Amino acid sequence: EVVTCDVNDLDFPSSEKFDRVVSVEMFEHMRNYQSLLARIASWMNPRATLFVHIFTHHRYTYTFEVRDESDWMARYFFTGGIMPSDDLLHYFQRDLCLVDHWHVDGRHYQLTSEAWLANMDAHRDSLMPVIAQAYGSEQAMRWWVYWRVFFMSCAELFGYRGGREWIVSHYLFEKP
């Protein structure tokens, strides 16, 4: 079963438990990892596993805060979010135990972002109506530019220092 929603609103009947849970690019939008992992653990059977795929900084954790108009990434894409450090999830093992942790250098996500940008540009005519529907026709061009800049920014960030500064981190947790 694949569930796509705001995890804050997600709830399962207490009788429904899972053996595997996968989270892809969701933890960056959350702040209270202890609470989040406790909720996820409550949905899991004993010995079940959680796989987390998340963007991280190799060393530092920082929040996405909107302080002024220059903070467009925080305002439009990661409102209230956080860029965790690669080791941050190591500190939240009350409900789930970390079994393994590895990372993929950022150049892979650089290439992904560049491919998404190229695909977006190649399909502009078919995407503009979708963007207009999502953001309103008056804002469509603005959001077209925001998305282009987003992909360019991600490509530059994740390619920086040979992909060793911002990375993709993977974690495997198990419920005792």
Regions inferred by a protein language model and the residue ranges of each:
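Substrate-binding/catalytic lobe of Class I Rossmann-like enzymes that use SAM or dcSAM, i.e.
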Residues: 56, 62-168, 174-176
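Alpha/beta-hydrolase-fold catalytic nucleophile elbow
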Residues: 53
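Conserved SAM-binding strand-loop segment of SAM-dependent methyltransferases
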Residues: 1-9
